[in-house]
Amino acid sequence: MKQTIGGFTDSAQGGLQGLPERSYGTALYRAAQADSRIVCLSADLARATETFLMRERMPERFFSLGIQEANMIGVASGMARCGDITFAHSFCVFVTRRVYDQVAMQVAYPRTNVKIVGFIPGLTTQLGVSHQAIDDIALMRSLPNMTVVEPCGPEQVPAAVQAVIAHEGPVYLRLSLASQAAEAARPLMTLDIGRGQVMVEGTDVAILATGMMVGQALEARALIAQHGLSATVVNIHTLKPLDIQLLERLARSHRAVLTAENHSTIGGLGAAVAEYLALHSLPVRFAMVGVRDTFAEGGNTPYLMKKYGLDAQHIAAVSRALCQAN
């Protein structure tokens, strides 16, 4: 027996046809089925943040605050103080830059158990500068008490949801839409907050990537292998706290370290790694791949990735240059 819910077809077995199995929306709904403390807040973007399933099936635990992101953060903090695990959703730019004072004063400072979930990070939107979050990691990473998480793809989203639920305190979860990331062939991955994941070991250059850039880094590894170079690729799914033990090991065992992020090179993953390398006098060649000190333009993601030097070919070129430097 099948039933239509919110325009999607729901099978009797409980799987949604139209919303991928590994989507955030599916993971949040299933987590809410298991934990009555979970509530879902939306700033008029239930479809665009994959939370329509909560709206349709658990309306008593879904709250639409309209296009009032600052108010949503305040409500989320208040509900968390009453014992809820509050998930607040919008696009990345709107739950970070637009509401930064509310996030700082009502979530980070009092350490309320609010999970701020942002979608369409960096260059993953065609809506141009107003919607391109290239500074959100920098903003959230600088807040005391804030944990920052970005899974590498659909295969890690379910684990990311479980990890942020288990983590007591504020979290910023940075996600791409399920429609922007093809259902991955790789098996489901775990996610331990604060511990990076080595995807594949190499010897010459360590490529530390986050989010969608992990896939680009793996492609770059294959490209530089054609030139006799071996790369370690690491999934840095937790941008704060950074896995400094892993970083130190990689810096001491490789000729070079390279970071790759769908974000500005100012204040993001690259800056965090550079800070640690410099402060601890680790003598390793280092470079960053990301959006340089510029606003991007509108366009599809492959075009923007190539234009701003975030694609696998550019990562490979920078890796080769690092390893060949005197």
What is each of the regions a protein language model found here?
Residues 1-174, 179, 190, ...:
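Thiamine diphosphate
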